[in-house]
């Protein structure tokens, strides 16, 4: 095991929300998270609401949690928030056996993911991407 990483310190104009052990592969989750990076939170919520991906609802809940943290814990203006960072990490991989023909068995791997969303309050005009 390696040395534990020091967690990133939030600035005064930032808020964070983390969703851990989400039942989706990191690759699939990253497709949805890439849609909202750098966008204003209103545009990002609209994009997630109309996304057809299964995991978009969980990402939307995590983004709403980050917005609520910004408003309640950090006293930030929610109308001027952007998604500053959104990244995906690997979690556990649960292994299961799948019974096959002729007395054989194969392994099924069910990956899990972690999701971190950091929103930042901006004062200058930022274009919605």
UniProtKB/Swiss-Prot annotation:
Function: This protein binds specifically to 23S rRNA; its binding is stimulated by other ribosomal proteins, e.g. L4, L17, and L20. It is important during the early stages of 50S assembly. It makes multiple contacts with different domains of the 23S rRNA in the assembled 50S subunit and ribosome.
InterPro entries per the UniProt record, alphabetical: Ribosomal_uL22, Ribosomal_uL22_bac/chlpt-type, Ribosomal_uL22_bac/org-type, Ribosomal_uL22_CS, Ribosomal_uL22_sf
Gene name of the encoded protein: rplV
PROSITE patterns in UniProt: RIBOSOMAL_L22
UniProt organism field: Bartonella quintana (strain Toulouse) (Rochalimaea quintana)
GO molecular function per UniProt: rRNA binding; structural constituent of ribosome
Family matches, as CDD domains: Ribosomal_L22 (cd00336)
Subunit field text: Part of the 50S ribosomal subunit.
Protein name per its UniProtKB record: Large ribosomal subunit protein uL22
Pfam families given in the database record: Ribosomal_L22
Family: Belongs to the universal ribosomal protein uL22 family.
NCBIfam families attached to this UniProt entry: rplV_bact
């Amino acid at each position: 095991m390696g040395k534990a990483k020091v967690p990133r310190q939030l600035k005064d104009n930032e808020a964070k929300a983390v969703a851990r052990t989400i039942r989706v592969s990191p690759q699939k989750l990253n497709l949805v998270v890439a849609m909202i990076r750098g966008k204003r939170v209103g545009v990002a919520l609209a994009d997630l609401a109309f996304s057809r991906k299964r995991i978009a609802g969980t990402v939307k809940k995590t983004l709403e949690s980050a917005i609520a943290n910004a408003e309640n814990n950090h006293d930030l203006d929610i109308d001027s928030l952007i998604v500053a960072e959104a990244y995906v990490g690997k979690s556990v991989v649960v292994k299961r056996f799948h019974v096959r023909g002729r007395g054989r068995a194969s392994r099924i791997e069910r990956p899990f993911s972690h999701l971190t969303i950091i929103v930042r309050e901006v004062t200058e005009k930022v274009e919605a991407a």
